[in-house]
Amino acid sequence: MASLRPNRCYRDVDKPPYTRKEYVKGVPQPKVVHFIMGNLSAEFPVKVNLVATRPIQIRHNALEAARVAANKYLTKMCGRMGYKFQIRVYPHQILREHKMATGAGADRISDGMRLAFGKPIGTAARVKEGQAILTVWVNPDKFPAAKEALRRAAMKLPVPCRIVIEQGKELLKL
């Protein structure tokens, strides 16, 4: 199986949206399993967002890695019912790759750049500058845990991020 190309091949928003799955054959499913986790029925007063600082495409495997990192830390620090966590973006953008044959005799097999549109290899979420990527709702005493969880998630993403308190700032001792 071929390895995954580096994210620098896909992170810039330089192509038009390519999202119509009904016209594209063989689009892989996104790796993101759950988009909302934690205690879904409770109300939490503090809402903290992870916000992108520039426009970018985030691949589905990076979103899943960020989700796993943040959710694991929140579960450990707040308990299973002590938080609500949501991924706010969905990977609609279909990523394509024109596979090139390499090695001995590749010139006989390969067509070069003829029909170079590419086959679908994955999906990505298009994020605008200032858009929330992840959101955590917690009680005021668990705010440091939410902040650390978002910091850990930000390390898995290909964009510099800011942590913004959207709701409940007056309840925190900052």
UniProtKB/Swiss-Prot annotation:
One of its GO terms (biological process) is translation. The keyword Aminoacyl-tRNA synthetase does not apply. It comes from the Archaea. GO terms for molecular function: structural constituent of ribosome. GO terms for cellular component: cytosolic large ribosomal subunit. The keyword Protein biosynthesis does not apply. Belongs to the universal ribosomal protein uL16 family. NCBIfam families: PRK04199.1-1, PRK04199.1-4, uL16_euk_arch. This is Large ribosomal subunit protein uL16. It comes from Methanocaldococcus jannaschii (strain ATCC 43067 / DSM 2661 / JAL-1 / JCM 10045 / NBRC 100440). The gene is rpl10e.
